[in-house]
Each structure stands twice: as structure tokens, then as C-alpha cells.
A protein has these predicted regions:
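Conserved acidic donor-binding segment of nucleotide-sugar-dependent glycosyltransferases
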Residues: 232-233, 237-244, 252-257
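Aromatic "clamp/platform" in nucleotide-sugar-dependent glycosyltransferases that forms part
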Residues: 200
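Conserved donor-binding/catalytic core segment of Leloir-type glycosyltransferases
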Residues: 4, 145-163, 169-173
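Short hydrophobic beta-strand element within catalytic cores of glycosyltransferases
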Residues: 36, 217-220
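Short His-centered aromatic/hydrophobic patch
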Residues: 58, 74-80, 95-96
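A conserved mid-protein helix/loop that constitutes part of the nucleotide-sugar donor-binding site
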Residues: 13-24, 160-174, 209
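A conserved, positively charged/aromatic
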Residues: 66, 91-118, 122, 127
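A short, well-ordered alpha-helix in the C-terminal region of glycosyltransferases
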Residues: 252, 259-274, 283-286
Length: 293
């Protein structure tokens, strides 16, 4: 099986990490992958560093390389458009965001759409995509070493116009707890005791999964696909997007080390059982085979 991956992102966000993890996982399974991504993108540079076949993204290269591969996998909206314009190969499209579909014509020709959550699947269906064309493939993350820190960690930029960051800061002030901001989550999780993830639109939340994999209890917004990975009071805390509710959630974990430990252990187990990179790779391969059969 030969797969051409397309990603137009210029930053290394959750979606780009998933592309990189998918390609490295596919290589372990004997699947040949090639990436087309923007020339200056971190994803392209990281793929080359991992010795994965990768080239700058462009319409002509999509057209040329699509003919040499069995299937094209577009990982975002712009690359979806490029695939439709430049290729007649079987097409799989990942949909990671919770926004409504803006251009329905784009969503009529792919062999399968990979929704990152059941919530995103419902958004696709509302946009006119037939249910039988949608497969839910959850993000996968590596299992990190258990965190041993004391910090209350929050993302400095979660791509949500800073609304979530402002809310986290307000809640931490109410709870009289200092926040540590991070732009390098995987590295900084080593210092974390609590992870706060607040957003107003979320397809799933791969940053949350990464924290859970390190056994860090999470306080997260009750929104989008997040309730599919966090079971309130079972493996984390879901809260309404109000400073008071968030402050209460942080305070519960701060004031009850036993609760924090229980939720952190359950969170790590959840990732082990359902959200590893291997789970994501194998489920994606199943979809590839279905499309090509």
C-alpha cells in the first residue's frame, strides 16, 4: 500500500503531530507513505528528520505523486481542495475541526471522511455527508512517563483566539493558584500536577490526550469532542466555561491529592486502552483497505 499525505499547515499543531505519528506508525506496518507539506513548515522538516519521504506541497506535485500512489490522504481543508483539483486517485479526508462545513461541493467525492470524534461526525452529517462515508478515527498519542511535577499547566496558545487562555488566567486568579503557561506541552508535562484545557470549539483535544497519557489530571471545557475522552469525575473533570466553574475544578484537584491521583491514573489507563498511536494507525489502515477494496 502506498499513501500520499497532504497537509497545508504552516505550524506544528495537533493535526500536524497526528500526521507525523501516522506516517511513522504506517512505516512500522510496512506501508509506504510520502508527505507533501509547505516548504518552510515544521511538519516537513520533522518528517525529513525522521527520514520519511517528504517534499514541498504544490499542485503539480500533488498531480504527479498521486498517480504513483494507491490513495491520497488530505489532512486539512486546503489540502482537500488541492487533492480534488489535482488528483483522480481514491481520496480519504481527515476532518479535525468542529466548524460547520462551508463548501458542500468539496464533500461529495472522497471515498471516506475520517472524523476525529463522534461530535465532528455529527457536524459532517449536518453538512450533508452521508453517514456511511464517515469513519470515526480518534487521535493517538505516545504513552509518556508519569509526571512527577507540582505545576498547574495551561496552553499559552490553543488556537482559540486566546479566549481559553484568558478564561484560564481568570479562573486561576479566583482560585489563588499560579498558572504555568506552555508552548511545549510534551516536555513541560514532566513538571505538571494539573492540566487546564479551556476552549470554545474543539473537535477532540489531542493536547488533553497527551496530558492524560502522562497521568496528569485534566480540567477541561465541556464542549465538542472533549466529553468523548473525559468522563467527568471518572478520569478528569469537565467544567462549564465560566471562571467560577473552572476555579472550582482546579481547587478540587489541588485540595484533594487522592482525587487527583485517582483521576490521573484513570486518565492514563484510558489512553492505554483507546487512544495510543497504535490504535490510531490500525484504525486508519482499516479505512484505507475499505476504500481500496
Amino acid at each position: 500500500m502506498r499513501i500520499l499525505h497532504l497537509d497545508s499547515g504552516n505550524e506544528m499543531r495537533g493535526g500536524q503531530w497526528q500526521v507525523l505519528r501516522l506516517m511513522t506508525g504506517l512505516r512500522r506496518e510496512g506501508v509506504l507513505s510520502t508527505l507533501l507539506a509547505p516548504a518552510a513548515s515544521p511538519l516537513l522538516q520533522k518528517a525529513l528528520k525522521e527520514q520519511l519521504p517528504a517534499e514541498p506541497l504544490g499542485l503539480l506535485r500533488v498531480s504527479t505523486l498521486a498517480r504513483r500512489n494507491d490513495l491520497v490522504h488530505a489532512h486539512d481543508a486546503r489540502s482537500h481542495t488541492l487533492a480534488l483539483l489535482a488528483s483522480r486517485s481514491p481520496l480519504v479526508v481527515s476532518r479535525r475541526v468542529a466548524f460547520p462545513i462551508r463548501s458542500r461541493w468539496k464533500y461529495r467525492s472522497a471515498g471516506r471522511y475520517l472524523a476525529v470524534s463522534r461530535f465532528v461526525k455529527s457536524v459532517l452529517e449536518a453538512g450533508g455527508v452521508p453517514e456511511e462515508k464517515i469513519a470515526v478515527v480518534y487521535d493517538g498519542v505516545p504513552l509518556l512517563a508519569p509526571a512527577q511535577g507540582t505545576a498547574v499547566l495551561a496552553l499559552a496558545d490553543n488556537g482559540d483566539s486566546q479566549k481559553g487562555a484568558h478564561l484560564a488566567a481568570e479562573a486561576a486568579h479566583l482560585a489563588h493558584i499560579p498558572l504555568q503557561w506552555t508552548r511545549d506541552l510534551e516536555n513541560d508535562l514532566k513538571q505538571a500536577a494539573i492540566f487546564v484545557y479551556l476552549t470554545y470549539s474543539e473537535g477532540l483535544g489531542s493536547a488533553v490526550l497527551l496530558a492524560m497519557s502522562a497521568g496528569v489530571p485534566v480540567v477541561a471545557s465541556r464542549i465538542g469532542g472533549l466529553p468523548e475522552i473525559i468522563f467527568d469525575g471518572g478520569n478528569g473533570l469537565l467544567v462549564d466555561n465560566s471562571a467560577a466553574a473552572v476555579a472550582e475544578g482546579i481547587g478540587k484537584l489541588r485540595d484533594s491529592p487522592a482525587l487527583a491521583a485517582r483521576l490521573g491514573e484513570a486518565a492514563r489507563l484510558t489512553v492505554q486502552q483507546r487512544f495510543t498511536t497504535e490504535h490510531m494507525v490500525h484504525r486508519t489502515m482499516e479505512v484505507y483497505r475499505e476504500v481500496l477494496s
